[in-house]
Every structure is written in C-alpha cells, then in structure tokens.
Curated annotation (Swiss-Prot):
Keywords: Cytoplasm, Ribonucleoprotein, Ribosomal protein. This is Large ribosomal subunit protein eL15. Belongs to the eukaryotic ribosomal protein eL15 family. The gene is rpl15. The keyword Ribonucleoprotein applies. Signal peptide: none annotated. Component of the large ribosomal subunit. It comes from the Eukaryota. One of its GO terms (cellular component) is cytosolic large ribosomal subunit. InterPro entries: Rbsml_eL15_core_dom_sf, Ribosomal_eL15, Ribosomal_eL15_CS, Ribosomal_uL23/eL15/eS24_sf. It comes from Mylopharyngodon piceus. The keyword Ribonucleoprotein applies. It is found in: Cytoplasm. GO terms for molecular function: RNA binding; structural constituent of ribosome.
Amino acid sequence: MGAYKYMQELWRKKQSDVMRFLLRVRCWQYRQLSSLHRAPRPTRPDKARRLGYKAKQGYVIYRIRVRRGGRKRPVPKGATYGKPVHHGVNQIKFARSLQSVAEERAGRHCGGLRVLNSYWVGEDSTYKFFEVILIDTFHKAIRRNPDTQWITKAVHKHREMRGLTSAGKKSRGLGKGHKFHLTIGGSRRAAWKRRDTLQLHRYR
C-alpha cells in the first residue's frame, strides 16, 4: 500500500484518539481564521488527489466555514402573506447541502477560477469546514494538459452555481446506486413527469 492509502484509512477512523485530537485542534484553528481563506496546501492530500487535485501551478485550495443548521425564511416579522400551509418560517430545510453552499461561496469570491470539487475537513457544534479545489483556467499548465482542458471551456463557467459539481449533483438526485436510481430522465421533475403522466397507447 502507498502512503495515501494509509492516510485514507486514518481518515476513515474519525473516532480514533489521534483523529479526534487532530480534528478538535484543527477546528479551533479554523475558527480563528476568516470564514473564507486560501489554504497553502490541502489538509487531506489523499482526498484532494482523488477528486482531481494536482500539486502544480494552476490549482488553488480555499477553506470555507459554513454555519450548521436549518434555514430561516427571510421574511419581515414572519409575515409570509399567504395561506397558512405556507406560513413556515423557522423549521425550513434548505434543499442543497452545506458542502454545495461552501462551493458556491468560493466560486463567488474567486470569480476568475473554476470550482473543480470539494471535501469535508472538520466540524463542530456551530460550523462545518470544507476545502474547495479551484482551477485557474488561463494558466498554461492547465490549458496545455489534455486531462484538464475540459474545464477551460466556457460551458463550465460557474458550474457550482448550476449544480454540476459532485455535491450539487447529489442534491439534484443524480448519481449511481440505490439512493439515486429513482431519478430517471435527468432530473427530479422529469422523473415525476414520467411517473405522473398517464400514457394510453393505441395498441394496449
């Protein structure tokens, strides 16, 4: 086994004494920093490499802090002006994951970079911390490499805003496995339409 495989196994046992101590100290450190800052290197190099990171020019890591918990509907004094069924203000759950929110914030802050992927690095009772991999698409090391040329195309601008990253696709119900096989047809709406439309074939 290579070194990264050993690191992967360490991260899989988050309740071990070593990892509990490390995560606790790191969370304290991250809380002292600003909510969005550039990290000099990935905290989890094994995970970052699995998600496409390379330790070369053109790749950037940003660490994002996101507040945990549900979403409160932003209405003045709870006045939603509607029917009682839609009066909910406090116990509203956001449709997307906090990881995709972190990606979006990084993408907004670094408008000239493209969001490749992200991963979890820690959490406490108030915050979750994610590291986002961003790519400088105008760097020659990226543009000249056939493996990374795909992200330089204009169609991938702000892919994190349109649910095209891994975290975004998961929130859209797209993926492989038993969690996602009900989303047939490309989207939840298409799957619903397909199931809910009565088809009366001529020869049946």
